[in-house]
Amino acid sequence: METERTEAKKRAFRVGEKFTTTIEKVAHGGHFIARHEGAVFFIRHGIPGETVIVEVTSTGKSFNRGDVVEVIGPSADRVKAPCNYAHRLGCGGCDFQHISISRQRDLKSEVITEQFARIAKMDLKVAVEEVAEPLHWRTRAILNIDGSGKAGFFGSRSHNSIQIDDCLTCVPVLKLAEITSRTWQPNTKLEISANNSGDRIIANAAVIEGPKELVEVVGANTFQVSHSSFWQSHKLAPAVLTEAVMQFAELQSGDQALDLYGGVGLFTAAALSAVGATGRVDLVEASSSAISDAKVNFGNVPNVNIYLGD
């Protein structure tokens, strides 16, 4: 057995080399685990149970990486990706678009369950619930501007810019098709944000189009959000996450709540409603931009304390 392990370690793979293998299970980060000649590979664009041909994209001491270049035995859950850029030579996002929506949720549940078991030593089964349609949900995007002034996304684990003409995960108000049709300052980046009211910010180190801040509304609460402050990119995530956090927190009137990594105060607002005037909420955040927004959002609330720090 020890001799076999030693021989497996001696096997050196080359970038560009191809082999046939079977995808075993999902891993964190949109990858899938497969093995070949005793070596572990993290594979993109596969589905567990599929027999595939893999091309090696990088090598390492403990594991290697590869892309599926041909599917020999496809899974019943394999579908045609709706986006033209969701492939091995496309942009680095949307790792699961080749998989049916129901199987995507199952795979994400497996990843979270495995993380709790491996890191926290907890036997916790997590179900990923359907929130909304699988496309047109992202309210924020960062685009790379290449040397010719054209906008695009980076390829997977790469600084190569992939020019695009649209992004199907972005909400229509971001107007990605219009953004990518324009010429920008070369070798920079664009940060684009939108809220559910239809306002859009385009920032290139500074805001160059649109309002300086967006106003987000979640339930009865209103938040100022600057372009450099964190806000959930999924348009429905703020409301869904707030409801989940408050269910777990079970805050009562008069309680003291600590909102770590509090951002602009999304959960602080909900916690404040629960603890009432006799309670207190302390928000801690490392981003000076988010802190500035939080002070605007809660500046006149006496029982909310805001701290800059990590």
Report residues per predicted region.
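Accessory RNA-recognition modules of RNA-modification enzymes
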Residues: E2-D310
